[in-house]
Amino acid sequence: MILPRLLFPVLVTAGGILTALVPTFARSAETLSSPVETTAPRDTAAYRREVRKAFAALRADSLSQAQRALEAALGHDPDAAGNDVLRFNIAKILMARRQWHDAEGRLRDLLAHRPDYGEAQIALAQCLSEAGKDSELAQWVDTLLADHRERTTDEVHTLLFLQSEACRRLHQDERALTALHRVLKTDRYNARAHSLIALQLYIEGHRDEALLHLGTALLRHPDDETALAVGAELAEREGDKVTALERLEHLLRLRPDDRPLQVHRATLLLDLGRRNEARRQLDSLRAAAGDELAEQLLPLYHRLR
């Protein structure tokens, strides 16, 4: 099954962290390092210097160096006005390094004294998802969406997709579908929601309804990756490997370096008897990946004999 890998990629990158830090630097130096009433020692010059170091490190993709600089900045001025932004970005760095437990702890600490920090709320949901804490995630999303805080449509959709995936893993299929239908209430042609509904309905045996949802997704958004992935999946389940291959190749044009998709393409080519194309795909994969994919490729090479 090719679908799950496409749905919930890690949403945190160094570039994303860099973008989030820009508002911090856009503030005046006075605002960035202005303290609240405190007796804690301050070194404003060192604070600014470490924040600039963090900014430069992120531009160079050095997450560990950026984290050290941000931690040092917090030590130089513990009560500066911009510190919550720095703490949030430390959590994002930990997420980018896939240190989910540590990131979750930082986000919970931040939310303990800034419970209205919207970006941190969503980042915590992403953390819980990546850590496999599905029950906590589903409840956290319910809590966030019940607080009537003003959120962007994208934020709400992010939370609902995370909840839907968590509920699917918990085998709470109706709850998963409910989350997806909530997406459609604000975006009636959302390709991802229609596609995931289609997959769930098909698995439950509601073939015709599933194909209607898939058709809506592919018609309205022919280049949507989730729609193409589900489309390939359902075509293969229907026994239509030609259509499955067409959709998979369309998806590969959008994700040309996706090796697991390339392996699946080689498998479909072999199933369809297109041995020369399959061999070229396998040889290309072996040349690019070396021994990394040897175990996966060996059975496919055996089929060429």
Q: PLM features: residue spans?
A:
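N-terminal leader/linker segments that initiate helical-solenoid repeat arrays
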Residues: T19-N89, A96
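Structural marker of alpha-solenoid helical repeat scaffolds
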Residues: H76-D79, H113, D147-R151, T186, ...
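Terminal, low-structured helical/coil segments at or just beyond the last alpha-helical repeat
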Residues: D271, N276-R305
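Helix-start (N-cap) detector for alpha-helical repeat units in TPR-like alpha-solenoids
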Residues: Y47, A81-D84, G118-E119, T152-H157, ...
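Structural signature of tandem alpha-helical TPR/SEL1-like repeats
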Residues: S62-R68, R97-R106, G132-T143, L170-R182, ...
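Canonical tetratricopeptide repeat
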Residues: V85-N89, A123, T158, L162, ...
